[in-house]
């Protein structure tokens, strides 16, 4: 497989996680996952920015993206069952990684929306890859490409969301 082809399939593989991670900006709101509870340090466990609607909406959107991908490239997945499971795990893993990042940011007393370089851009990716590993994985070279490429996509998407008025800060 050539380098460009390898990069394309790496992006195709991770696409459900990208969509899942971006969707809560548009679908979120409502009841916070932590229910307003505080950790023993006195800070919120996750904060108002992590809601059930955003989490479940993100997992749903990411899973749907995987189903659509299956119909476009069935050979990539082998079966619809594998596509649904992989897309669900990538999406769920991405948002679990985002929740862990939010938890860590609250422990560091970082306010909601405050940037944490590396944690914001890669936490969701690493968690998505880990959750999906038992079903289907990609090469180490493809993983390295995603580790380099994802922060660029993340920063660009956040800036776009800011310019569209969907986010209050450009990071």
From Swiss-Prot:
<keyword id="KW-0472">Membrane</keyword>
<keyword id="KW-0594">Phospholipid biosynthesis</keyword>
<dbReference type="InterPro" id="IPR032690">
    <property type="entry name" value="CarS"/>
</dbReference>
<keyword id="KW-0812">Transmembrane</keyword>
<comment type="pathway">
    <text>Membrane lipid metabolism; glycerophospholipid metabolism.</text>
</comment>
<keyword id="KW-1208">Phospholipid metabolism</keyword>
<comment type="similarity">
    <text>Belongs to the CDP-archaeol synthase family.</text>
</comment>
<dbReference type="GO" id="GO:0043338">
    <property type="term" value="F:CDP-2,3-bis-(O-geranylgeranyl)-sn-glycerol synthase activity"/>
</dbReference>
<dbReference type="Pfam" id="PF01864">
    <property type="entry name" value="CarS-like"/>
</dbReference>
<keyword id="KW-0460">Magnesium</keyword>
<feature type="transmembrane region" description="Helical">
    <location>
        <begin position="141"/>
        <end position="161"/>
    </location>
</feature>
<keyword id="KW-0808">Transferase</keyword>
<dbReference type="InterPro" id="IPR002726">
    <property type="entry name" value="CarS_archaea"/>
</dbReference>
<feature type="transmembrane region" description="Helical">
    <location>
        <begin position="115"/>
        <end position="135"/>
    </location>
</feature>
<feature type="transmembrane region" description="Helical">
    <location>
        <begin position="84"/>
        <end position="104"/>
    </location>
</feature>
<dbReference type="GO" id="GO:0046474">
    <property type="term" value="P:glycerophospholipid biosynthetic process"/>
</dbReference>
<keyword id="KW-0443">Lipid metabolism</keyword>
<dbReference type="GO" id="GO:0005886">
    <property type="term" value="C:plasma membrane"/>
</dbReference>
<keyword id="KW-1133">Transmembrane helix</keyword>
<feature type="transmembrane region" description="Helical">
    <location>
        <begin position="7"/>
        <end position="27"/>
    </location>
</feature>
<feature type="transmembrane region" description="Helical">
    <location>
        <begin position="55"/>
        <end position="75"/>
    </location>
</feature>
<keyword id="KW-1003">Cell membrane</keyword>
<comment type="function">
    <text>Catalyzes the formation of CDP-2,3-bis-(O-geranylgeranyl)-sn-glycerol (CDP-archaeol) from 2,3-bis-(O-geranylgeranyl)-sn-glycerol 1-phosphate (DGGGP) and CTP. This reaction is the third ether-bond-formation step in the biosynthesis of archaeal membrane lipids.</text>
</comment>
<keyword id="KW-0444">Lipid biosynthesis</keyword>
<protein>
    <recommendedName>
        <fullName>CDP-archaeol synthase</fullName>
        <ecNumber>2.7.7.67</ecNumber>
    </recommendedName>
</protein>
